[in-house]
Amino acid sequence: MDLTLLQWGDAGWGDELARGAMMTVVVAACSYFFGIIFGSLFAAAKLSRFWSLRLLGDVYTTVVRGVPELLIIFLVFFGGGTLLRTIANGLFGYEGYIEPPIFVIGVLCISVSAGAYATEVIRAAVLAVPPGQIEAAKSIGMGPWLRLRRVLIPQAARFALPGLGNVWQFTLKDTSLISVVGLVEIMRTAAMGAGSTKQPFTFYITAFVIFLLLSSVSNRGFLKAEKWANRGVRSQ
C-alpha cells in the first residue's frame, strides 16, 4: 500500500478523492431530499381513501423495491437519451446523439429508489400517531391544516426518524452505483486511480474508509436528531 499516492497536488490523488467525496455527499443529499418528497407524496397516496391513489402508491413501492437500483440507472440513462433524441428530432429535426446529464440522472434514479423505502417509513410513522390525539385536536376546533402542522407532522417525524436514518445510509451507499454511467464520485475516482497507478488496494481501501467515515458521522447526526425529537417524551 503506497500512501504517497494519496498526497495532494500533481504527485498524488488526494485532491481528486476529496472532490469525489464531495460529489458523493452532494448526490446523496439531493437524492435524499427528493426521496423524502417522493416518500411523503406516495405515503399520502397509500393512506388516501381513494383506491386509485392507494393502487398508485402500491405499484410504485412494489416495482421500485423489486428492481435492482443498477437496472433503474441503466433504464433511465439509456431511455432518457432515447427520449431526448426523439423530442429533439420531432421538434428540431436533430438526429445526433444526446447524452442526458449524468448528475441529474444519478439524483433522479437514487431519489426514486430512496422514495420507495421512505414511503413505507413515513406511512408507518403516520399510522403510529395515536388516533386520540387527532380526535382531541378536532374537538378543540383545529382545522385539517392546523392538525397536520401542529399534531400529525411533529409526532410522525419523531416516529419516522430511525427509519429515515436507515434510508439515508442506503442512499449514501447507492451513490457508488452512479459510477457505472460516468459520474466522478468516490468509486469512479478510486477506479481511475487504481487503473492509472496499478495500485487498486490503496484506492479501494481509501474509498472504504471515506464511506465508513461519512456513514459514521451521519449516523451520529441522526442519533442526536432522534434524541432531540424525543425530548420530554416518557420512555415506556
Curated annotation (Swiss-Prot):
Instruction: List the InterPro entries hit by this protein, alphabetically.
Output: AA_ABC_transptr_permease_3TM, ABC_transp_permease_HisMQ, MetI-like, MetI-like_sf
Q: One Pfam annotation, family name?
A: BPD_transp_1
Give the UniProt keywords, A-Z: Cell inner membrane, Cell membrane, Membrane, Plasmid, Transmembrane, Transmembrane helix, Transport
**Where is the major localization of this protein?**
membrane
Under SUPFAM superfamilies, the record lists: MetI-like
Describe its function. Component of the nopaline active transport system probably consisting of four subunits: Q, M, P and T. This system is also capable of transporting octopine provided that catabolic functions are induced with nopaline.
| UniProt-recorded name of the protein | Nopaline transport system permease protein NocQ
Q: Which organism is it from?
A: Agrobacterium fabrum (strain C58 / ATCC 33970) (Agrobacterium tumefaciens (strain C58))
